[in-house]
Amino acid sequence: MKHVVLNNGVKMPLLGFGVFQVTDLAECERAVEDALRVGYRLIDTAASYRNEAAVGAAVGNALRNSGLARGDLFITTKLWVADAGYEKTKEAFDRSMKQLGLDVLDLYLIHQPYGDVHGAWRAMQELHRERRIRAIGVSNFHPDRVMDLIVFNEVAPAVNQLEAHPFHQRLATHAFLQEQGVQLEAWAPFAEGKHDIFHNPVLAAIGASHGKTVAQVILRWLLQRGIVVIPKSVRKERMEENFAVFDFELDEAAMGEIAALDTRTSSFFDHRDPAIVKWLGTRR
């Protein structure tokens, strides 16, 4: 597995496994166990996914039975909006760690850029200093919100997890994050199937030239840009397919063809839309 080195020296796998919308806990536990068997070492969950306990059970089983050591794994979870704030963040972190069955978390992210994010960040900085978290970061933060945290705090975010796929490539945001030493991590790399992405003729043709699927082309494109990516599947054969992306390389022409697909628009929603802020900010 290839890694990136975060701005605090922590190594993070480039390719991981996400569990968003895997709400059946037995299915989630089984999926994470399968992912670990396939070779994934980065597992990404969140308090709002309501499956941290299943992830923790799968990780615990793997550590007991597979020969994996805790240091082989990189576990991420996220703080939800309702828990933003200094004291609430510490309480939420303890709940997540109990669900996960861990003593130390590899990466803790503020899930959305709303509420008392500065209070949350102060708590996360303390947990980081206490070595209960190896790295701290954010999710869905626009560049101005990232800079706000950098300017007014001691510790800069190590990661910003954002929607990123061929139709929303985040070129300018990626360049900004690189300048600030913040690692971009992509959620929804396949745009959840929108835009008929798996039948896109450009991506399909590139895949055919390498004997690879559209999904593999997309993942390879992200990896070659140095972006961490966390595809999700509950099917082991699809996990294996998504993992088989280190044995080929896209040339400059293919990268250019994919670059031309960019619409610079979210396939889901605008995190600055007041209606979206209200919707996410009032979810529990």
Where are the regions that the model predicts?
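CE4/NodB-like, metal-dependent polysaccharide N-deacetylase domain
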Residues: N7, T89-L109, E126-E130, V182
